[in-house]
Amino acid sequence: EKNMPIVITTWSFTNASQKAWEVLKDEGKALDAVEQGGIVCENEQCDRTVGYGGSPDEDGETTLDAFIMDGSTMNVGAVAALRRIKSAISVARHVMEYTTHSFLAGELATKFAVEMGFKEESLSTDESRELWSKWRFEKQCQPNFRKNVKPDPRKHCGPYHKKRNFVDYIHPEVFVVDQYNHDTIGMVAVDSKGDVAAGTSTNGAKFKIPGRVGDSPIPGAGAYADNTVGGAAATGNGDTMMRFLPSFLAVEEMRRGASPANAAKTAIKRISAHHPDFMGAVIALSKNGQYGAACNGIETFPFVVQDKTRKTFEVVTIKC
């Protein structure tokens, strides 16, 4: 039984889901739905972890990572460490549609965006400046992502230098994802034609080291889509999760016959075998419109589903 069109979205980002659904229910394209949904979160600054004015880096700057994938062509567009451009997922789509590349990063991705007609503007807000200044001056740069450097990053701000001799201590988990700090929007859609698309958008980890790129823009990590199978998206501690390509793994598990929920579980277990306490979740959607999710390191994980069988969106919450 085919259930399409359908869109699933990480966390309780219902406005983004509704926007994507508006595109899909009128026979629109999955790719457009994912981009439009992402734009909503970038503009609404979903939980301050998507879009401008959130998650300042060590220097106080907000930079964006985004990704979009077309499961009908296997084409990808991605941007990382994007500076001074609000609409990261749209820039990612421009990389896909106006270049033969897949991925642009940093200052020169900004140059490309400006050439493509995007407006350059500061991504900082009063709120992000205040958050940063508290971290820098009241909290002595705690928490941060440094290790094996001097001065001791657990007590002091930089500039840091590497320690000559060090014992690699277990760094406390800095990246806390909970219902107040959702770190990424991830979205997977199947349209009425059966085309699959997936995408992500995020401003990354709060107080990240400048230049840090998370899992969101990495194909197969943040999201993945393949018309012959379905799609998946991931959210959580990107530094850890990207090493396991969970979205790719979930799609491959579905290819081998696993249900979306079991496929997501396998992807999560592959990570938790090495990092039992990592925080994250994977959502998966088959080309026929079956869906499921799995999570780790938080108590529960909500995701949004919208399809023809529902009058409005439904927030489905699973236990981790």
From Swiss-Prot:
Any matching Pfam family: Asparaginase_2
Glycosylated position list: N15
Record-linked Gene3D superfamilies: (Glycosyl)asparaginase
Subcellular location(s) per record: Lysosome
PANTHER family hit by this protein: L-ASPARAGINASE (PTHR10188), N(4)-(BETA-N-ACETYLGLUCOSAMINYL)-L-ASPARAGINASE (PTHR10188:SF6)
Listed GO biological process terms: proteolysis
Organism: Spodoptera frugiperda
SUPFAM superfamilies for the chain: N-terminal nucleophile aminohydrolases (Ntn hydrolases) (SSF56235)
Catalytic machinery residues: T184 (nucleophile)
Subunit structure: Heterotetramer of two alpha and two beta chains or heterodimer of an alpha and a beta chain.
EC numbers on record: 3.5.1.26
Purpose: Cleaves the GlcNAc-Asn bond which joins oligosaccharides to the peptide of asparagine-linked glycoproteins.
Annotated catalysed reactions: N(4)-(beta-N-acetyl-D-glucosaminyl)-L-asparagine + H2O = N-acetyl-beta-D-glucosaminylamine + L-aspartate + H(+)
Lineage start: Eukaryota, Metazoa, Ecdysozoa, Arthropoda, Hexapoda
Disulfide partners: C41-C46, C141-C157, C295-C320
Protein name: N(4)-(Beta-N-acetylglucosaminyl)-L-asparaginase
Binding-site residues, substrate: R212, V213, G214, D215, T235, G236, N237, G238
